[in-house]
């Protein structure tokens, strides 16, 4: 996985989120769960030997009851922290890649410092996620059109 690949993924995300003709930060709101899983599945399709983990943050951004999902992708001995809906919190962010880390503990620490809140691994995606991709896309489209 390299920067060019991540830029391609980012453009796919933006295409979906901008389909409702709303500002990106508005379309990204309330779509982190489905978008994170959808993007994780795209990456898993392209790189079947990597590990795709969903990290869940609770009470993030100093807000009670505000939760958020991001990806921790392990490729070889490197972890990539990716937020497919980063724009809901940071309108002007140019990149979905938050950081590269050496281990999961450092990923959790970064997420806690960046977003605050309590972070944990909520699930690990496998090839079974491919069956739900269309469903997640539909939920995202419904969310951004409402």
Language-model regions, residue ranges each:
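A structural boundary/capping signal
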Residues: 1-146
